[in-house]
Regions:
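Thiol-based oxidoreductase modules, predominantly thioredoxin-like and allied folds used
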Residues: 6-7, 26, 30-43
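Structural micro-motif
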Residues: 48-57
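Non-catalytic, surface beta->alpha helical segment in thiol-disulfide oxidoreductase systems
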Residues: 58-84
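Conserved strand-loop elements at the edges of beta-sheets that form or border functional pockets
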Residues: 38, 50, 70
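Local sequence-structure signature of Cys/Sec-based thiol-disulfide redox active-site neighborhoods
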Residues: 1-25
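A structural signal for the main folded, soluble domain(s) of proteins
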Residues: 23, 27, 31, 61-64
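Short alpha-helical
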Residues: 13, 40-43, 75
Length: 84
């Protein structure tokens, strides 16, 4: 099963731009989305090696398949989420 894991921070301006794009793409493609604020819950971010925000990770069957870091246009987010 595929899911998208999204790491952000309250202070992160690019995160605020990316979150609506990620939410829209995951809803459109019916992909589960998990959102983590690294300010409040950094354990998973550390475990997954997240060092920049925003970081979006595509996980399939518990294995990281790909990650996207930083600000990206809508079409790239769509492609990232919809890829199999």
């Amino acid at each position: 099963m595929k899911k998208i894991v999204y790491f952000s921070g309250e202070w992160c301006a690019p995160c605020k731009v990316m979150l609506p794009l990620v939410k829209e793409a995951t809803k459109k493609h019916k992909v589960p989305l998990e959102i983590y604020d690294t300010e409040n819950d950094d354990k998973l971010a550390i475990q997954m090696g997240v060092i920049q925000l925003p970081t979006i990770i595509r996980v399939e069957d518990g294995v990281e398949m790909r990650r996207m870091v930083g600000l990206h246009p809508k079409y790239e987010v769509e492609k990232f989420v919809s890829a199999s």
